[in-house]
C-alpha cells in the first residue's frame, strides 16, 4: 500500500485539483462580490455548520475514536468537483457551485488543519495532536491542493483553447482516479472492512442527509433563491473524498481513520441523485 499512499494518492489528488483549476476564471472569484449573501451562506454552511453537525454526531454516536476522527476528516474536506455537475442536473446555480468549490478548496489549507486540530482537542485525543504538526499539515495541503489549482488556472489563462478542450477529459480522468483511490482504501482494510462499514456507514448516512437538509433550509431561511438553495445543499452533501483519504493517510497512517470516507463517498452520490430527482420532479409538477 506504500506505493499507493506515498506516490499515487498525492498525484491523483494533485491532478484532480489541477482539473478543477482548468475550469476556473477570474469571474469565479469575483462572484464573492457579486453574490456575497449566496456565497457566504454556502461557505458558512460548509465550513462551520457541517463540522459542527459532524462533531455533535460523533459525540453521541457509539463509535471508536479512530472512526470519529475519520468522520471529522470527511466533514472538514471541501466540496467535491462533481458537485458542479450534479448542481447542473438539479437546475441549481452552477456558477455559485464552481465558486464555492474553488474558494473553499483553496481555503482548505487553513480550514482543514484548524477543524481537525480543534476536533482532536475536543474529542480528548491530545496524544494524537502532539504527533501532528500544524505547519507540515498546511504545507502538505498547500502543495497538493493549492499549487495544482493555481497551475490549472495559469494554464487556462495562457492556453485557454487547449485548456477548454482538455478540461472535460481531465474531469473524466479525475473521476477514474477517485474510484481507484476509493477502491485502494477499501482493499487496504479488506480484513476489517465489514465491521468498519457497519460501524461507520450509518453515521455517515445520517451526517450526509442531515447536512443537506440543514443547508437547504438555512439557505431558505436566509433568503437565497431556489437555484442557490439547491446548489448549497449539494455542496454540503458532496465532499472531496480523495482529499479526506489523503489527509487520513498522511496524518494518521490510514486504517480506521480513512474508513468513514469510503461509505460517505458512496452514499453522497446516491443521496445527491435522489435530491436531484426530487427537486427536478418538484419543478416539473
At which residue positions do the language-model features occur?
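Alpha-helical transmembrane segments of multi-pass small-molecule/ion transporters
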Residues: 1-285
Amino acid at each position: 500500500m506504500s506505493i499507493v499512499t506515498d506516490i499515487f494518492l498525492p498525484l491523483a489528488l494533485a491532478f484532480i485539483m489541477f482539473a478543477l483549476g482548468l475550469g476556473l476564471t477570474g469571474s469565479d472569484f469575483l462572484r464573492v462580490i457579486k453574490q456575497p449573501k449566496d456565497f457566504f451562506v454556502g461557505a458558512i454552511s460548509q465550513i462551520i455548520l457541517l463540522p459542527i453537525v459532524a462533531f455533535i454526531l460523533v459525540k453521541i454516536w457509539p463509535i471508536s475514536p479512530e472512526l470519529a476522527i475519520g468522520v471529522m476528516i470527511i466533514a472538514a474536506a471541501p466540496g467535491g468537483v462533481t458537485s458542479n455537475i450534479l448542481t447542473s442536473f438539479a437546475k441549481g446555480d452552477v456558477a455559485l457551485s464552481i465558486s464555492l468549490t474553488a474558494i473553499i478548496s483553496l481555503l482548505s489549507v487553513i480550514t482543514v488543519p484548524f477543524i481537525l486540530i480543534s476536533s482532536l482537542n475536543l474529542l480528548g485525543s491530545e496524544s494524537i495532536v502532539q504527533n501532528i504538526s500544524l505547519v507540515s499539515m498546511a504545507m502538505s495541503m498547500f502543495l497538493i491542493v493549492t499549487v495544482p489549482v493555481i497551475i490549472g488556472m495559469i494554464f487556462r489563462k495562457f492556453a485557454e483553447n487547449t485548456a477548454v478542450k482538455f478540461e472535460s477529459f481531465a474531469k473524466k480522468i479525475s473521476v477514474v482516479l477517485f474510484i481507484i483511490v476509493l477502491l485502494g482504501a477499501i482493499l487496504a482494510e479488506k480484513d476489517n472492512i465489514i465491521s468498519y462499514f457497519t460501524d461507520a456507514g450509518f453515521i455517515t448516512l445520517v451526517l450526509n442527509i442531515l447536512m443537506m437538509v440543514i443547508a437547504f433550509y438555512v439557505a431558505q431561511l436566509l433568503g437565497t433563491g431556489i437555484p442557490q438553495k439547491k446548489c448549497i445543499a449539494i455542496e454540503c452533501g458532496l465532499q472531496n473524498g480523495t482529499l479526506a483519504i489523503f489527509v487520513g493517510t498522511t496524518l494518521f497512517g490510514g486504517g480506521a481513520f480513512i474508513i468513514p470516507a469510503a461509505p460517505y463517498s458512496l452514499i453522497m452520490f446516491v443521496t445527491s441523485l435522489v435530491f436531484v430527482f426530487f427537486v427536478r420532479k418538484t419543478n416539473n409538477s
